[in-house]
Amino acid sequence: MNNSRMSSVSTQKTTGRSALGTKSALAAIIATTMMVSVASAASLQTTKATEAASTGWATQSGGTTGGAKASSSKIYAVKSISEFKAALNGTDSSPKIIQVTGAIDISGGKAYTSFDDQKARSQISIPSNTTIIGIGNKGKFTNGSLVVKGVSNVILRNLYIETPVDVAPHYEEGDGWNAEWDAVVIDSTDHVWVDHVTISDGSLTDDKYTTKNGEKYVQHDGSLDIKRGSDYVTVSNSRFELHDKTILIGHSDNNGSQDAGKLRVTFHNNLFDRVGERTPRVRFGSVHAYNNVYVGDVNHKAYRYQYSFGIGTSGSLLSESNAFTIDNMKKISGRDKECSVVKAFNGKIFSDKGSIINGASYNLNGCGFGFSAYSAKIPYKYSAQTITTSLANSISSNAGYGKL
């Protein structure tokens, strides 16, 4: 067996005499054959697959190593949804490295027919102690979600993930059409590193939406959700593009009993390109965002820029040396137009150090939102470089999949 590929192994059960030579015996074999999908071990194609998170909240409390300790029998190369599922092996939490060597259609090429069908087939659960890494620029996922739920120690690297399209959005009177399904979900999970990942609406951008009941027929939800007490997460060197409501940290104002003291997330060296809002919006959590680049346009026909940092109930955010390039900014509530990069949703704690807006320094701490300064100690080592246009260009060119 070629150990660089996934395979299906037929386990045959026979009784009595040999099946050879008689049609009846052959029929008996076929009737009792069980097709079992198993994953074949593969060689390690990149040493990057064994790296651990090196900075940010994902380094704390034991760190995030994913499948770095995988035995040779738990290293896989996959390029189809059947191979991917076989490598994941359900809830198996033994360390594993899954190298994605092709574009994986999570639907298996079979269109979803209803909400229930999409729920059953599109949500792919990732077990503990797993690294999923794309090889070169080949690692892609479409038509589904990677769900990291109720587990620990997961790494997603060098992947392109197209945000799923809800085939059956629900309509709410007064709120219009609302979609389910996020590209990546981190739910009730600790220690996750997302690095060099691109998440995009891809083939169905929002300007292609149709209209139903006189309302825009919205079919996208979020790019990344981090919720229900998840903790110790780093998102780095990634690219979020062509999306509206992008990253949500903390899903409800009423979930403080589970979220308070958790939802600690670091964003660094990421590019947010033509996204509308929520980069991120945070409730209860503590977010550190440094050396990120935000590019938007208030007049964009599909992804109208609204804000970058949304400070929600009991949420806090420290911004350091970020670069915002936002076209057609406007004053909001009498404040300088630069203040529109931050929005207060009942949150009280926000500070910025050294960020630039459209190439110039600006004091975001003086916008008059009534925020208290972010005073919590950052426990990990990091280097927030002084942001310049040159550095912003470098961060942008290095962000996303295919750049590892």
Curated annotation (Swiss-Prot):
Residues 1-41 form the signal peptide. It is found in: Secreted. It is an enzyme of class 4 (lyase). The active site is at R278. SMART domains: Amb_all. Binds 1 Ca(2+) ion per subunit. Its cofactor is Ca(2+). One of its GO terms (biological process) is pectin catabolic process. Ca(2+) binds at D182, D225. InterPro entries: Pec_lyase (IPR002022), Pectin_lyas_fold (IPR012334), Pectin_lyase_fold/virulence (IPR011050), PEL (IPR045032). Pathway: Glycan metabolism; pectin degradation; 2-dehydro-3-deoxy-D-gluconate from pectin: step 2/5. Its main location: secreted. The keyword Secreted applies. Keywords: Calcium, Lyase, Metal-binding, Secreted, Signal. PANTHER family: PECTATE LYASE 18-RELATED (PTHR31683), PECTATE LYASE 21-RELATED (PTHR31683:SF18). Involved in maceration and soft-rotting of plant tissue. Pectate lyases have been implicated as pathogenicity factors which induce maceration or rotting of plant tissue. PelE is sufficient to induce these effects under laboratory conditions. This is Pectate lyase E. The gene is pelE.
